[in-house]
Swiss-Prot record:
Function: RNA-dependent RNA polymerase which is responsible for replication and transcription of virus RNA segments. The transcription of viral mRNAs occurs by a unique mechanism called cap-snatching. 5' methylated caps of cellular mRNAs are cleaved after 10-13 nucleotides by PA. In turn, these short capped RNAs are used as primers by PB1 for transcription of viral mRNAs. During virus replication, PB1 initiates RNA synthesis and copy vRNA into complementary RNA (cRNA) which in turn serves as a template for the production of more vRNAs.
Family (UniProt): Belongs to the influenza viruses polymerase PB1 family.
Gene Ontology MF: a single term: RNA binding
GO BP annotations, alphabetical order: DNA-templated transcription; symbiont-mediated suppression of host gene expression; symbiont-mediated suppression of host mRNA transcription via inhibition of RNA polymerase II activity; viral RNA genome replication; viral transcription
Ranges of residues in domain RdRp catalytic: 286-483
Organism per entry: Influenza A virus (strain A/Brazil/11/1978 H1N1)
Keywords: Eukaryotic host gene expression shutoff by virus, Eukaryotic host transcription shutoff by virus, Host cytoplasm, Host gene expression shutoff by virus, Host nucleus, Host-virus interaction, Inhibition of host RNA polymerase II by virus, Nucleotide-binding, Nucleotidyltransferase, Phosphoprotein, RNA-directed RNA polymerase, Transferase, Viral RNA replication, Viral transcription
Main location group: host cell
Sequence segments annotated as region (Promoter-binding site): 249-256
Transmembrane domains' residue ranges: none
Species classification: Viruses, Riboviria, Orthornavirae, Negarnaviricota, Polyploviricotina
Protein name per Swiss-Prot or TrEMBL: RNA-directed RNA polymerase catalytic subunit
Region described as Disordered: 53-82
GO cellular component labels: host cell cytoplasm; host cell nucleus
Amino acid sequence: MDVNPTLLFLKVPAQNAISTTFPYTGDPPYSHGTGTGYTMDTVNRTHQYSERGRWTKNTETGAPQLNPIDGPLPKDNEPSGYAQTDCVLEAMAFLEESHPGIFENSCIETMEVVQQTRVDKLTQGRQTYDWTLNRNQPAATALANTIEVFRSNGLMANESGRLIDFLKDVMESMDREEVEITTHFQRKRRVRDNVTKKMVTQRTIGKKKQRLNKRSYLIRALTLNTMTKDAERGKLKRRAIATPGMQIRGFVYFVETLARSICEKLEQSGLPVGGNEKKAKLANVVRKMMTNSQDTEISFTITGDNTKWNENQNPRMFLAMITYITRNQPEWFRNILSIAPIMFSNKMARLGKGYMFESKSMKLRTQIPAEMLANIDLKYFNDSTRKKIEKIRPLLIDGTASLSPGMMMGMFNMLSTVLGVSILNLGQKRYTKTTYWWDGLQSSDDFALIVNAPNYAGIQAGVDRFYRTCKLLGINMSKKKSYINRTGTFEFTSFFYRYGFVANFSMELPSFGVSGINESADMSIGVTVIKNNMINNDLGPATAQMALQLFIKDYRYTYRCHRGDTQIQTRRSFEIKKLWEQTRSKAGLLVSDGGPNLYNIRNLHIPEVCLKWELMDEDYQGRLCNPLNPFVSHKEIESVNNAVMMPAHGPAKNMEYDAVATTHSWVPKRNRSILNTSQRGILEDEQMYQRCCNLFEKFFPSSSYRRPVGISSMVEAMVSRARIDARIDFESGRIKKEEFTEIMKTCSTIEELRRQK
């Protein structure tokens, strides 16, 4: 029988058909090779947008810097970064006038955070530029290396463990005439292998001390390393993103804390909330505009797109904003917040790995590191690369490019949102003083603008005024990529609005399926994704039930754990059949042990082990969850786990799922090849941190986890905790006098050793 597909949609409102338009199946594109070209593009473009600014030279590093602030106003529609200070300050003043006390209150909240935040805040985050080794490292390692170098240079404020004290060390380090660092290096030598009698290359890892003079240190402290952004869909070209070093991160964190606090109080801000909360917030703004426009006015909405948002933003503008926002606050607070924008106006972009050349005829490959680009003969490069290098050469210092204007991706999302909202705020009638008015939504560089006016001419005038106001603040609305519709249909941050936000379920498709972490986590994540989509994305019960069956099927094929009574032969089927036959209560077997699936859409919130616990044979329970069983990994499981979900569009989302530590929650072993590289020292450091943190967790278990308040080191905190616990246990008779005395003696010994050190 032929089915006419249009019949499927007869009963469906048009907006619900959005999920059928989804183009993103399959894997997103990843980048290969070096990001040097993309970074040079970013640097060159940023300077081009500000080319009519003033050139100056940084007195400390000698880096040439371009300052477009208060530069000539553009005469055409080309993107430009000439923000006008007085306009930005006025926009801030009007924002405060419409929201009395907003800046004052946010400053008070932030001041509290600044005084309480501990330095371990900086261990969050993935890759970080490690200035001591001049390459990227996991955040925790980069922080540890920085602190280690600070201490060996006599900078000790960080020992208090407060972030603000660590930042005092950062400030002081910039005044030092020289800084001594420890770097890793590799020695290669050819030796004869005793067994095979062949020559082999032996690598040994050494650590060596190196002195950096003030200029070299400042360049490193102000450096942002660059990488290529991966997994971006819908783009032909890749682009560069930046990872700042530890000196900058802490200051940025405090600025963003202040900006976040302001955004929370602004109804037009799409940050920092997300998901349903964000949809509700946005729907309110739309409702306000539609109810006011019913009789006399018409209402239109622009789905907006800005050209090169962060390349036209300017740290100097952010400095002006912060100076205004904190104007009645204590000096120390104003200083600490102004450092991030100052560092960004003096930033250097590291060009990455450089270029790879290969000669087909001689079968030779060689890497030209970024440091050599300043004086290498350009005849080896093709035309487009040659142009890039020629353009960037005046800006190069030691393989990094001076990049004063522009912000680099993702650095000040919250603060730039405040800037955007300040323009939306100017759309009130009391400011436009005419018949048109506007409002809208802003989330980082994405915006939606709603304009109301008595007639079409008024709408046009309103849009023009908005466009020109943006130009004054260094924001460039793209006329080519923005489009206008009757209010009621628009898109904002990948949410599609049509008389209400439409659930675009297909966006979530990539996160369905088996993640490949381990059998325990994958089962939990799989059912949690289905549960979340029933809550948030209009996934109906019938479809959810089908998704669940498909997931179980996928899971069984991935881990070769078909039911014990199946005919399918796999590598595991022999073991699974044996287990099936000797199990009395077969319903109690986990799916990953060949058991049946007991999940349905009503019990998705229960971890599988809990769901089947009552049904399990006793000896099976004893093997599955016995903490003494060496195969039960308790290492990662902390009652709640986090998985990173990649939706098809938009940022990766953190998703919490429950999992129970069982023999199935294994952690795969690290690749052994790392042990022979210069990373080995780093690996050992990491393991040491892991051990220290695990020990600390033992003293302060999550259930009673009150952060040790006050200024004490980890060791002091653990010793004092041990003493308190020992006294309580002794007085309640849980431990004997001898044990109590021994604990007290050990504590004193530890303190004595610390004093001697």
